[in-house]
Amino acid sequence: MLNWVVTFLVIALIAGVLGFGGIAGASFEIAKIIFFIALILFVISAVVGFLRGRNRV
């Protein structure tokens, strides 16, 4: 349990340094792009899975 506390403390400290250091603006734009790419891939995967599921029945 203590290992998890130390791990999350380190992650929180790194996130705080990056957030207050000005890197957050650039990271936010990259995160938006990655989010939309993941969303598109999810929709494609769901549609293909739905269509393949229908053919097997």
From Swiss-Prot:
Superkingdom, natural source: Bacteria
A Pfam family recorded for this sequence: DUF1328
Membrane topology category: Multi-pass membrane protein
Coiled coil feature spans: none
Entry's transmembrane regions: 4-24, 30-50
Family according to the record: Belongs to the UPF0391 family.
Keyword vocabulary terms for this entry: Cell membrane, Membrane, Transmembrane, Transmembrane helix
Organism whose genome encodes this protein: Nitrobacter winogradskyi (strain ATCC 25391 / DSM 10237 / CIP 104748 / NCIMB 11846 / Nb-255)
Cross-referenced InterPro entries: DUF1328
Protein name as annotated: UPF0391 membrane protein Nwi_2359
Taxonomic lineage: Bacteria, Pseudomonadati, Pseudomonadota, Alphaproteobacteria, Hyphomicrobiales
Localization: Cell membrane
GO CC terms, sorted: plasma membrane
